[in-house]
């Protein structure tokens, strides 16, 4: 019987990936469609992906699939063909290719079955997730940005918006997608007569959000096809002005893709212009925050003097201090302090 999960340590896997000579391509994709048996589908896809040396993070649920992966460049076309023939619903599926890619985005394949491919918190049996808003392509996005009757809504989390967003886009201040949905409805009541344009990283969140807005009585709703990644790629290919400002946060080891030269965020320690996220080097903290090179040197990669001091302690003492401590990494929010999260790099499904 084939092994359908990883048995090698993260350190060993990462070292193996870093030693690879063949370049890799980072790809993301999603599809809302009915999967009758998510576990069986997961196990079958796991065998397909491992045979092609695919790394990454894949979620499956009855409502569909959500994936961020890394594929050896020589196997990208084979991967595409096998994905398209795996299920008729996946035939011709758009694959978002990373805008900036060092090939080191993932080093292990993790595939999980979940209740939802995006945790939306929706518990309304009358909600029709297929009744989505209209798609906007790159040229349409730019036209909408110049339309005074249009309102752009960023359906990403606060730490994503902080480092990059579309011109004049509204932020829905929240730490997770499930918190954003009811807030978006509330905040946009005063714009009910406007054209609502929703966007996110790759399209999966804004697609469901557009259906939620329509469910709540908003009639003029659009969302950007393929999200920021597809927009920036197509705008560049077509010689259009790229109207996204700053960096696009991504949920892998890269933590960001440069879209424009502007740096709109600031170091969380000294306030200098900076948009590079990192995790606190103290294993008992792992706070996700923005740190400039000067502060990284000053604090040895830590978020505070306290963590810097703890990192300098003998490993045994560090482990003792971590024991019993709330185990969960955190995300820095300037308005609310430290927020709990389960991953060093936040979970894209949240």
From Swiss-Prot:
Disulfide feature: none
EC number(s) per entry: 1.14.-.-
Catalytic activity, as annotated: uridine(34) in tRNA + AH2 + O2 = 5-hydroxyuridine(34) in tRNA + A + H2O
Protein name in UniProt: tRNA uridine(34) hydroxylase
Family classification: Belongs to the TrhO family.
CDD domains per UniProt: RHOD_YceA (cd01518)
Record's keyword terms, sorted: Oxidoreductase, tRNA processing
SMART domains: RHOD
Uppermost EC category: oxidoreductase
Active site positions, chain numbering: 200 (cysteine persulfide intermediate)
Region of interest (Disordered), residue spans: 319-350
HAMAP family for the chain: TrhO
Organism encoding this protein: Salmonella gallinarum (strain 287/91 / NCTC 13346)
Gene: trhO
Entry-linked Gene3D superfamilies: 3.30.70.100, Rhodanese-like domain
GO MF terms, alphabetically ordered: oxidoreductase activity, acting on paired donors, with incorporation or reduction of molecular oxygen
Function, as annotated: Catalyzes oxygen-dependent 5-hydroxyuridine (ho5U) modification at position 34 in tRNAs.
SUPFAM superfamilies assigned to the protein according to its UniProt record, in alphabetical order: Rhodanese/Cell cycle control phosphatase (SSF52821)
Annotated Basic and acidic residues bias: 319-328
């Amino acid at each position: 019987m084939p092994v359908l999960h990883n048995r090698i340590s993260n350190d060993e896997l990462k070292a193996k990936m870093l030693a690879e000579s063949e370049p890799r391509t980072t790809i993301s994709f999603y599809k809302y469609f009915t999967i009758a048996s998510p576990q069986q589908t997961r196990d079958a896809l796991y065998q397909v992906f491992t045979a092609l040396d695919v790394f990454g993070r894949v979620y499956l649920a009855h409502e569909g699939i959500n994936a961020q992966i890394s594929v050896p460049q020589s196997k990208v076309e084979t991967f595409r063909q096998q994905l398209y023939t795996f299920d008729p619903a996946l035939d011709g599926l758009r694959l978002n290719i990373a805008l900036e890619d060092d090939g080191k985005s993932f080093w292990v394949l993790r595939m999980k079955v979940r209740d939802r491919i995006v945790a939306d918190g929706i518990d309304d049996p009358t909600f029709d997730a297929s009744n989505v808003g209209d798609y906007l392509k790159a040229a349409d996005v730019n036209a909408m940005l110049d339309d005074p009757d249009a309102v752009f809504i960023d359906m990403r989390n606060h730490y994503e918006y902080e480092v990059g967003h579309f011109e004049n886009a509204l932020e829905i201040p929240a730490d997770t997608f499930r918190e954003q949905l009811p807030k978006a409805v509330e905040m946009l009541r005063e714009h009910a007569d406007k054209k609502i344009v929703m966007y996110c990283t790759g399209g999966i969140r804004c697609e469901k959000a557009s259906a939620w807005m329509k469910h709540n009585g908003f009639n003029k709703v659009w969302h950007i096809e393929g999200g920021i990644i597809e927009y920036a790629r197509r705008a560049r290919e077509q010689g259009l002005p790229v109207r996204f400002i700053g960096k696009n946060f991504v949920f892998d080891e890269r933590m960001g893709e440069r879209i424009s030269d502007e740096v709109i965020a600031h170091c969380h320690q000294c306030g200098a212009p900076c948009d590079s996220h990192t995790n606190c080097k103290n294993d008992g903290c792992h706070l996700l925050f923005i740190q400039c090179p000067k502060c990284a040197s000053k604090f040895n990669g830590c978020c505070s003097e306290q963590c810097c001091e703890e990192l300098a302690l003998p490993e045994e003492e560090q482990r003792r201090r971590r024991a019993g401590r709330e185990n969960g990494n955190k995300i820095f929010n300037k308005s609310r302090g430290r927020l709990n999260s389960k991953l060093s790099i936040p979970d894209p499904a949240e």
